[in-house]
Curated annotation (Swiss-Prot):
PANTHER family: TRANSCRIPTIONAL ENHANCER FACTOR TEF RELATED, TRANSCRIPTIONAL ENHANCER FACTOR TEF-4. It is found in: Nucleus. PROSITE patterns: TEA_1 (PS00554), TEA_2 (PS51088). This is Transcriptional enhancer factor TEF-4. One of its GO terms (molecular function) is RNA polymerase II cis-regulatory region sequence-specific DNA binding. Residues 38-114 bind DNA. GO terms for biological process: cellular response to retinoic acid; embryonic heart tube morphogenesis; hippo signaling; lateral mesoderm development; mesenchyme development; nervous system development; neural tube closure; notochord development. Residues 172-445 are annotated as: Transcriptional activation. Interacts with YAP1 and WWTR1/TAZ. Transcription factor which plays a key role in the Hippo signaling pathway, a pathway involved in organ size control and tumor suppression by restricting proliferation and promoting apoptosis. The core of this pathway is composed of a kinase cascade wherein MST1/MST2, in complex with its regulatory protein SAV1, phosphorylates and activates LATS1/2 in complex with its regulatory protein MOB1, which in turn phosphorylates and inactivates YAP1 oncoprotein and WWTR1/TAZ. It comes from the Eukaryota.
Amino acid sequence: MGDPRTGAPLDDGGGWTGSEEGSEEGTGGSEGVGGDGSPDAEGVWSPDIEQSFQEALAIYPPCGRRKIILSDEGKMYGRNELIARYIKLRTGKTRTRKQVSSHIQVLARRKSREIQSKLKDQVSKDKAFQTMATMSSAQLISAPSLQAKLGPSGPQATELFQFWSGSSGPPWNVPDVKPFSQAPFSVSLTPPASDLPGYEPPPALSPLPPPAPSPPAWQARALGTARLQLIEFSAFVEPPDAVDSFQRHLFVHISQQCPSPGAPPLESVDVRQIYDKFPEKKGGLRELYDRGPPHAFFLVKFWADLNWGPSAEEAGSSGGGGGFYGVSSQYESRELMTLTCSSKVCSFGKQVVEKVETERAQLEDGRFVYRLLRSPMCEYLVNFLHKLRQLPERYMMNSVLENFTILQVVTNRDTQELLLCTAYVFEVSTSERGAQYHIYRLVRD
């Protein structure tokens, strides 16, 4: 398989392809400014505060009145609160949510005047005014086309904003939902005895049909169905001089080589909570779940390990001198099939790139094994990993990852039956043990 690329898919469907395009903010609070838009107190928006403010604008895109959940704290924040929090962490100086809101409004009015002053004819001015009238203050100063006019901002945050732009979706956090349980009960098939005069017992009830065969003990405890099971999944980087897989660094890793029958059942998450994290158009999570089967849908929360050594790996991408970036996966089945595996990388709920691979079965020890090994990671993902790693704080990385997802769909190539659908969401690991994960079943009550 060749290097990943954007454009029309290869004949065998093996390459990465680009795909579809990708209000608390600015409201409330006193203005805190004079009639000319200048601050009412000297130093309120000093250069260091303004620098941090601009960085925060790039990190936290407009999200209306939605709240963002910071998983390491478990608290919900509006965008202006996050910006104020960022300023405090970066500069040690306190700015309130209302001060942030007022500053956004001041900049929005200033930006509106600048744009209109540069337009010469009245028609263009009217059109620009109508467009800006539909935008909130936060949208006006955060729109990518206007970002360059806002003055200096941190190179790391600005690069990432331009690289990872898109409309914001609602917040999402995996709830700790326990599976529904119900006390056992029994039904007696023997009619009650009665000594009442004239009582005639009803005819004997027909015996119940034999129960359906039980699914494998692991099935409710691992990522898989009776038809197809995920055995292993990993995304990794290998240094240029690697001689075996032990030298690779694992960003994420799932191993289900020996699922334990005694493990607790998977917790459940309502699939509707994450619809907007994935494309709404054909092939999106909602449409796939509507088609089913529902027992084939899973959610995996990864805590990714981004500590992959010194700058030797930072020197290049998958095609350069910085090592090999790849993805490997392995499945097992009792059926002989040809699998098609589609992996869609999504930003703000929009598909960015897709890779489609096909794999035939190998018979091993009475079971059919499917291995998709060392599939090259697309350049988009490699660049994203490097830019993400440049952010100085973990919570900044998690804020970016809040809007990064992957949807992986495995089907039977010949019948087009959906066998497994897995939604992946991400945070940054702080564990000394490296990458961690948790698997959930996706349900819809």
